[in-house]
């Protein structure tokens, strides 16, 4: 009996494919059942984060046919939405990102839907902004964020510039499943779409409005012009170079050294296998350059410039990486103190963080009289809180949102994390502390002295292959069927299961949070984009060593469960 995946493979092999890279790849795997099964037994699933997969031939890979199919599904949904019948598109520096962006534009144009596409790579915040600026029905960002070079992806956005809602994504997925991957999508060439006036480039007016929206969120305007901040910046061969340097120069930062090997777009990411500003390897070249130049600060943005990581210069001249939680707390503290001082703090201010981000932020928010809301993981839930404030005519109350995974936003002009404003505010904050004879390191130590030494660490456990998802499901179910009563000798005093919305007041999510008798917390959840289970630890100690020792005890106790 010939399996269905074998038949699908044969169909692709015999088709007249319009991508020269795919045919040799298909011929090469002839007779290799395991490889054919991996590529054709399943299709990439379209969810609220869109698509993400390895580049290559097959239904379980990212290629022009999977992009056409996904875009036809999106187009079918857009046609039911009325409005402008317009979709905004942007893309990052990844391999084939520009090709996939133009492919999506061709499908939309063939469906009589207008397209606004950037004429060169631009980051996530630029896509979110254009979606709102042109009052689009949807937006598409071609990116796989900080995954290795062999990946690409396709993020879909709703009309508010927020990643697509579960309901809309479910309808799009249904439409995708009705569309034959090779022949089902309507299509015209990009050139034809431009000629017919269906495809237009994003105008300079939109780009300028984005920069103005970001720069209007400075806490102490003009400060950077005289503070003399010395900066090293790396776009990690991604889309951050133009927007980040433009905004930093606009606010008065002149001394910017770009890491030369990581300056220009390069989808092969030859300097680091994982272009992720959360990890040391991605920041290593920048750190070396910071040491050489004596920079006050080193910044790195990921390929789609929605996350930013930093290293700060300490008073003793050494450099220290700063976690996403620490940067989030530093920014919250800086924005609150600065806006109170300048008289620009709104009445009843609101900040938002994800449930896995540090509780230290709660203590800081309380100190400044700010309402801090905790939402599910995924920046769209922070965007959703902004939308709720907007609907009530109170959008000015929103001052800041962050996730521990290096995502920040300090205004309602976009609805996704924005490494451009993150970079601007981090630089302004560093410049301010420099101008008063302090530093980021000193301020962070003062915060710990005031509120306690919190340590936040994440461990990831990988579950590769087709069976990986099943193992992850079984593991999470096991934690529910046989609940833990203690971890490393600490009694569990409260378990919050986010699959029970009636208990949390939030939409259902596959997340378990354990609160221990000493005030520490452990969060267990599967990753939304990778075959991993993540465990987040928040421990508290008199000093860093004590907090780290606590974390190690908890991690050792949980390791056997993840085996």
Predicted regions located by residue number:
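Gly/Ser/Thr-enriched, mixed-charge loops and adjacent short helices
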Residues: 35-40, 44, 152-285, 289-290
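An N-terminal, well-structured beta->alpha segment
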Residues: 4-104, 111, 194, 199-227, ...
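Short acidic, glycine/serine/threonine-rich loops at helix termini
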Residues: 98-103, 128-132, 150-156, 177, ...
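N-terminal small/polar loop signature for handling phosphorylated ligands or for N-terminal nucleophile
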Residues: 88-151, 249-309
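Conserved phosphate/anionic-ligand binding catalytic regions in large, soluble enzymes, centered on
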Residues: 40-60, 144-145, 231, 235-247, ...
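Phosphate-binding and adjacent anionic-ligand microenvironments
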Residues: 291, 295-297, 318, 338-525, ...
